[in-house]
Amino acid sequence: MPGVKVKEAEPFELALKKFKKQCEKAGILSEVRKREHYEKPSIKKKKKAIAARKRAMKKQRKMMD
């Protein structure tokens, strides 16, 4: 769980920025978006296969250069 200790002279905006950065690193926002709506297992499997194909194509293009 991200947490930020705010110093006396530190502006709120800076503390908020630090908190947002920690949340992003922890993957909280992506997890919330992923859990927002139910996704059928078959669709999850399809997305995973598509992502694997994209990674393979990208790796292959990188090897060609």
Swiss-Prot record:
Name the UniProt key words of this record, in alphabetical order.
Answer: Ribonucleoprotein, Ribosomal protein
Q: Name one GO cellular component term.
A: ribonucleoprotein complex
For biological process, the GO terms are: translation
> Domain of life here?
Bacteria
* UniProt xrefs under InterPro entries: Ribosomal_bS21, Ribosomal_bS21_sf
Q: Which Gene3D superfamilies match?
A: Ribosomal protein S8
What GO MF terms are annotated?
structural constituent of ribosome
Family under the similarity heading: Belongs to the bacterial ribosomal protein bS21 family.
**Name of this chain's protein:** Small ribosomal subunit protein bS21
